[in-house]
């Protein structure tokens, strides 16, 4: 689990379609003042885990949570790790994700490596983001939480060049 924990949505029902809205996720931060609003004292400080990731449509929730963490921690937020139903991944010493097991895959959402930018636009405030790096982990892949490096069969993957992307002309 995470020191910073997702504890559901702030509305009364589980609404994944609201996940990209600002403050739609109830978070327990590691630095919370009260026992009931603080994440676990053990667990990852480099990742925020979200369970049933694909099954319950939680990509938007994870994106907005990591954007909020980016703001909260001054641009040095943790990665989001989306683990699907009946799937698991080993977190070794809060440094390495490896040894995926189960029925599906794991997504890693990273705002820092490509210097993602984001803002909350419209009413209700909805996340708009650019340069968010997403890795999909399957058997034989690892993710170094310290270096923010994805590897397949022990070979690091090249970090994409985000400057090559341009806004489409309409």
Regions found by a protein language model. Name each.
Residues 1-3:
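Beta-edge loop/turn motif
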Residues 5, 10-170:
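C-terminal and late-domain segments of enzyme folds
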